[in-house]
């Protein structure tokens, strides 16, 4: 259970911000905690802070034990062991990162026909809501994000809906949300069984294969994948690298992946191509990685575009070793050394300030750069092969003929 005080939202420099707020959460204690002191549990379960920090927080009431509906006083917590049915109550000072402002606060507040919370509605009935997700905002609560997420914003406008699939924070486009668990299950089943045709758009570096055969007109996008001679297929495996986790857990197993690509238009002055992308499998960052391996990364991809990447060691590894398990020169020790490089470059990109929150002493984070909150990758079409539904958004501005 979670209790949140009224939050304050404001916009600044193109960002939607939430002022830090207090959040109180409560849950029954875990079985492995029984018979232990609260301070010992906190130190062993949450190792990021020293023992002295948790002692101070217990005295301040940040962590409390509720027994038979009555909170134990801090002094008693130092000597009282945890019992079955105790409830741990935690009060935290939440610092949410800002997200990209997608509309004015006035537009966000007033729902007009075809819009909710400032998001364009593609389709809505009693079972589902389909919106055109803007880039720069997470779909659902994750990590430090909670209030600044699409599902929580929709709740403020009377819609409690579940996302049917994942769209990254910086990706835009079609987002199908189910208003009940049955609808969510049906759509997710279609996706898992590959009964769903998904087409994304991306703007990439260079002249993509077969782009010399396309006609630059507004209708070019409507004929994607009709001419099989223009299709490029990338079939290299996909794995993820998570520097926040220790090696070897942070390096996932390679999994087979297939993406088909089709050029739509070529912008000669910029030497960039808009391509349609049809992922047959659904691996994390699959389209982005496959485009990078083809030598045509997404133009503004700060992870997988070699011209602007903030993570050159990670990018080099992913492009050089499509299936890292098969490389004889990558033994456990070499992998550990390389993984440490991934960790180091991630730390170097952490945008921290030299100031601390006066209430909770959390290190303040610098505002993100607006350009880092947008990726020229857009979920454009979703179609159920049995004809149950077919949804499509307008072309994003960067894919339009007059936005070259």
Swiss-Prot record:
Keywords: Cytoplasm, Isomerase, Mitochondrion, tRNA processing. It catalyses: uridine(31) in tRNA = pseudouridine(31) in tRNA. The active site is at residue 168. It holds the Pfam family PseudoU_synth_2. The keyword Cytoplasm applies. It is found in: Cytoplasm; Mitochondrion. One of its GO terms (molecular function) is pseudouridine synthase activity. This is tRNA pseudouridine(31) synthase. It comes from Saccharomyces cerevisiae (strain ATCC 204508 / S288c). The lineage of its organism: Eukaryota, Fungi, Dikarya, Ascomycota, Saccharomycotina.
């Amino acid at each position: 259970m979670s209790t949140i005080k009224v939050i304050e939202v404001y916009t600044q420099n193109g960002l939607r911000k939430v002022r830090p707020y207090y959040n109180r959460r409560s849950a029954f204690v875990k079985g492995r905690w029984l018979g232990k002191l609260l301070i010992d549990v906190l130190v062993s379960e949450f190792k990021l802070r020293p023992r002295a920090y948790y002692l101070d927080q217990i005295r301040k009431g940040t962590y409390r034990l509720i027994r038979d509906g009555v909170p134990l006083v801090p002094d008693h917590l130092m000597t009282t062991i945890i019992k079955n049915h105790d409830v741990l109550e935690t009060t935290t000072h939440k610092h949410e990162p800002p997200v990209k402002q997608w509309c004015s606060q006035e537009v966000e507040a007033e729902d007009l026909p075809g819009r909710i919370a400032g998001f364009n509605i593609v389709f809505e009935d009693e079972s589902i809501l389909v919106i055109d997700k803007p880039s720069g905002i997470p779909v659902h609560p994750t990590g430090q994000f909670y209030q600044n997420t699409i599902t929580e914003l929709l709740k403020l406008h009377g819609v409690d809906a579940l996302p049917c699939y994942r769209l990254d924070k910086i990706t835009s486009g079609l987002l199908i949300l189910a208003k009940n668990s049955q609808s969510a299950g049906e759509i997710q089943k279609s996706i898992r069984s590959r009964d769903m045709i998904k087409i994304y758009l991306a703007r990439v570096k260079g002249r993509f294969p077969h782009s010399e055969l396309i006609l630059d007109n507004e209708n070019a996008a409507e004929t994607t994948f009709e001419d099989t001679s223009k299709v490029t297929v990338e079939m290299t495996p996909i794995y993820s690298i998570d520097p926040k986790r220790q090696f070897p857990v942070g390096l996932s197993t390679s999994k087979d992946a297939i993406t088909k690509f089709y050029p739509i238009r070529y912008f000669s002055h910029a030497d960039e191509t808009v391509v349609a992308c049809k992922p047959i499998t659904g691996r994390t960052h699959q389209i982005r990685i496959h485009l990078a391996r083809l030598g045509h990364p997404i133009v503004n991809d700060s992870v997988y575009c070699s011209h602007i990447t903030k993570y050159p060691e990670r990018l080099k590894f992913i492009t050089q070793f499509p299936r890292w398990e098969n490389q004889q020169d990558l033994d456990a020790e070499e992998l550990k050394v390389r993984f440490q490089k991934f960790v180091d470059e991630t730390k170097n990109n952490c945008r921290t300030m030299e100031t601390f929150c006066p209430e909770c002493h959390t290190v303040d984070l610098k505002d993100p750069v607006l350009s880092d909150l947008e990726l020229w990758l857009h979920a454009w079409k979703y179609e159920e092969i049995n004809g149950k539904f077919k949804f499509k958004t307008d072309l994003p501005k960067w894919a339009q003929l007059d936005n070259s």
